[in-house]
């Protein structure tokens, strides 16, 4: 009886780990970056986020409540996906490298958000395909004024056994975010939920346990 019980426990644990890994690979984690000058991480010279294939990068644009600030003071940005050389100089070569435009700081539905999925294959002809072990580079240019201020981000796609590069931002929470602990004035926080399907492992555990108990 004890041997059967131990086997049942091992089976449940093994299946649970397998289901968790499958959900992790299928759903991916979300990494949130607040793209505004108040984000202190952009003050680092090598601000880097580590992701894995099937993860998501959520870019949250600057947002202000209507009437909270003067229109000429709000931040607007054009974001580019560029090569390393352009990342270093912060000068994109072509308008074809434009990835997104954060140009609706007073959007009625809340802050604009853009999503990048780091997938190996894409069904779109002009889509970007990402590879493990490589680093991808994002930079922005301000729309709200003509200046040389540059905000830039490195995203490293690591494999299962690939060690992260130096100075990589890897928070412990499942929802990876650079949201500051102290609320910023005039900036609305974004709300994100767990990307994994809720309750699936627990439900499977229960069914397996019930079936095994019926056999005892």
Curated annotation (Swiss-Prot):
GO biological process, one term: negative regulation of dendritic spine morphogenesis
GO cellular component, one term: plasma membrane
Signal peptide (from-to): 1-28
Keyword Transport: no
Residues carrying lipid (GPI-anchor amidated serine): 195
Glycan-linked positions: 36
MF terms in GO: ephrin receptor binding
Keyword tags: Disulfide bond, Glycoprotein, GPI-anchor, Lipoprotein, Membrane, Signal
Ranges that cross the membrane: none
Propeptide: 196-216
Region annotation (Disordered) ranges: 162-181
Keyword field contains Glycoprotein: yes
Residue intervals of the Ephrin RBD domain: 29-161
Pfam entry (one): Ephrin
SS bond list: 61-102
InterPro entries the UniProt entry points to: Cupredoxin, Ephrin, Ephrin-A_Ecto, Ephrin_CS, Ephrin_RBD
Similarity comment: Belongs to the ephrin family.
PANTHER family: EPHRIN, EPHRIN-A1
Function of the molecule: Cell surface GPI-bound ligand for Eph receptors, a family of receptor tyrosine kinases which are crucial for migration, repulsion and adhesion during neuronal, vascular and epithelial development. Binds promiscuously Eph receptors residing on adjacent cells, leading to contact-dependent bidirectional signaling into neighboring cells.
Summary of subunit composition and partner proteins: Binds to the receptor tyrosine kinases EPHA2, EPHA4, EPHA5, EPHA6 and EPHA7. Also binds with low affinity to EPHA1.
Protein's name in the database: Ephrin-A1
Species per Swiss-Prot/TrEMBL record: Xenopus laevis
Gene: efna1
